[in-house]
Each structure stands twice: as structure tokens, then as C-alpha cells.
Amino acid sequence: MKDKQAKNNYLSLTGEVVFNKLLIPDEYLGNKRYTLTINLDKDGIKLAEKNGLKTDDYKGKTQITSKRKVEYGMPKVYNADKEEVDATHLSLFGDKVTMLVKQGKQKENSAYTYLERVRVEEKAEGVEEYDYSEF
């Protein structure tokens, strides 16, 4: 397998969306962040382990959550044709994605990742673009 690590500690992690908090950011201790949690696929697990990233095991699946502070702007979202699309293109769960993430710079944060971009490789079956206006 070709090493997917790029310059400046950027990594491409692949898997299936579990929690999508791009349009309605998470708020924790007064800090708002865009977050995306995915179940990593086999290649994603290998890359995360190789780079010492913080993952969680849930019901036999290896998950990773990447974050981005709201003040940095929403991460860009792309479709499978690599065209930039609206964030509503990303389903709340089930889509197969590639996340471009950056490892934390501080030694104590090196296991965490910061979300840069997301590409939807395959839409979840039976799931359409989400209409957030209902909230």
C-alpha cells in the first residue's frame, strides 16, 4: 500500500460517516466545532495506527472523529467527481467518504486530527441530501 501521508502532516482517511456535524456544529465548553465521525475502512485503520491517531472502538468498528474550529470556516465538501458541492450533499450518516485531515502540531495533541476537506465517494443507499431547514 502506498503511504497516503502528504506534506505538512496531512492524511487521507477513508470510511463511512457515523456522525456529521458540519451544518450544525458541536458545542463543548463554549467552543463550537465542525466534527465528522467515520467508521474507518481497512486502509483507514492501517493509516491511523501507523500515525498514532486517536481512534475509538464501538461495536467492533474503529471510529475516528476529526474537528475544525468554526472560526476557520466550514470544511470544503466535494462529490465523487471532485467538484465542490454544498455541505448538504454529505448525508447525516452512511456515506462513504475520504477525509483530508491534519495531525495536531503539539506533542500532546499529535493523536488528534483537524478536518480540512471531505469527498463523498459513494452516497448511502436510500439517503438523500439533508434539508436542515426543518430544524
Task: Please provide the spans of the model-predicted regions.
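Short glycine-rich beta-strand segments
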Residues: 67-69, 102-106, 121
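Beta-strand/loop nucleic-acid-binding surfaces
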Residues: 63-88
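OB-fold/S1-family single-stranded nucleic acid-binding modules
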Residues: 107-127
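Acidic, gly/ser/pro-rich intrinsically disordered tails
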Residues: 1-11, 123-135
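OB-fold ssDNA-binding interfaces and closely related basic DNA-contact patches used
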Residues: 1-69
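Extracellular structured ligand-interaction cores
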Residues: 33-35, 94-98, 115
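Exposed beta-sheet edge/beta-hairpin loop segments within beta-rich domains
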Residues: 80-97, 103-112
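Residue-level recognition of well-ordered beta-strand positions that form the cores
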Residues: 37-39, 100-102, 117-119
